[in-house]
């Protein structure tokens, strides 16, 4: 149970191109990366560069713009989203990653998962099994959807949970989502924020701050909880180096060069790794 590798997302809303980010990420000391998958964006150059530099392809992140369509829209819109998940599975298979990440839902007002959505998801779950790809669903807003999906499919070997520490704080009202879903744990998206700062849950609070910085997460407690569920995969961080709209909590990052930001990200990620490995 010794998580030695630390991984990070490519992108981060940075001004530096994804192609140029990869070498900087490698030079900082990270062991791997994950990429977003988008039907209209060809990342072959970036992915190939990461492979050639010896970076692990930890996962590919499926689009999430239409996850609510799977549960609440007609077949045309639902199929569009399902086909994008299938596209993400194909990309992972092509480049040798065995994991994709999906949101369970999108939309702060969605709280009514249904059997229709569960039946529709069967298409991608069967395809993932055929391609030998695992799918980890995140704790996002509308945690009822994650519960419904894992109740239906969580015992399948290709279906699991991606723990997002930031979402837990600002979307899930700091509820212990690992206590609910830890037995399904496949992956992490580790980041911090200021919690829910107003009366309503909002995307603007999902700041993706560095650990051990100025967010509200208790990183020792997070390490303890991950250990409780025997997590031994790479410690994967999902970070953003720009402010969300109407927020200024990332001002200090915006003043850094990308090289400075990634060096600081690695320093903080390594701090967490050392705490985790001492558990």
Where are these regions (language model features)?
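Active-site acidic/histidine proton-transfer and metal-coordination neighborhood
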Residues: 71-160, 260
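A short, acidic, amphipathic alpha-helical segment used as a generic capping/interface helix at domain edges
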Residues: 214-228
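Surface-exposed, active-site-proximal loop segments in enzymatic domains
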Residues: 64-83, 106-116, 201-210, 245-256
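Acidic/histidine-rich catalytic cores of soluble enzymes
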Residues: 122-216
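N-terminal pre-domain/capping segments
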Residues: 1-87, 93, 129, 183, ...
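Short helix-capping segments at alpha-helix termini
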Residues: 52-55, 127-133, 153-158, 228-231, ...
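Acidic-and-aromatic substrate-binding clefts and catalytic sites of carbohydrate-active enzymes
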Residues: 11-18, 32-45, 69-70, 107-112, ...
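Hydrophobic faces of well-ordered beta-strands that scaffold small-molecule active sites
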Residues: 4-10, 33-35, 57-62, 100-102, ...
């Amino acid at each position: 149970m010794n998580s030695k590798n630390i991984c990070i997302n490519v992108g981060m809303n940075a001004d530096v191109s994804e192609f140029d980010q990869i070498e900087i990420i490698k030079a900082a000391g990270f062991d791997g990366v994950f990429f977003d998958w988008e039907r209209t964006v060809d990342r072959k150059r970036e992915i190939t560069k990461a492979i050639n530099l010896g970076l692990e392809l930890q996962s590919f992140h499926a689009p999430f713009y239409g996850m609510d369509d799977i549960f609440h829209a007609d077949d045309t819109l639902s199929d569009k989203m399902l086909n994008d998940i299938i596209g993400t599975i194909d990309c992972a298979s092509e480049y040798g990653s065995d994991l994709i990440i999906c949101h369970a839902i999108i939309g702060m007002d969605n709280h009514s998962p249904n059997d229709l959505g569960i039946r529709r998801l069967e298409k991608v779950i069967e395809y993932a099994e055929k391609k030998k790809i695992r799918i980890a669903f995140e704790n996002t807003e509308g945690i009822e959807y994650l519960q419904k999906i894992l109740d239906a499919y969580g015992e399948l070997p290709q279906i699991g949970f991606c723990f997002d520490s930031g979402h837990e704080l600002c979307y899930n009202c700091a509820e212990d989502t690992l206590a609910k879903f830890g037995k399904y744990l496949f992956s992490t998206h580790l980041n911090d924020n200021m919690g829910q700062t107003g009366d309503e849950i909002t995307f603007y609070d999902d700041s993706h701050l560095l650990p051990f910085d100025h967010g509200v997460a208790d990183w020792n407690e997070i390490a303890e909880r991950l250990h409780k569920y025997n997590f031994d995969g790479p410690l994967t961080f999902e970070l953003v180096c720009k402010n969300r709209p109407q927020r200024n909590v990332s001002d200090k990052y915006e003043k850094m060069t990308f090289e400075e930001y990634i060096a600081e990200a690695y320093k903080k990620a390594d701090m967490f790794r050392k705490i985790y490995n001492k558990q």
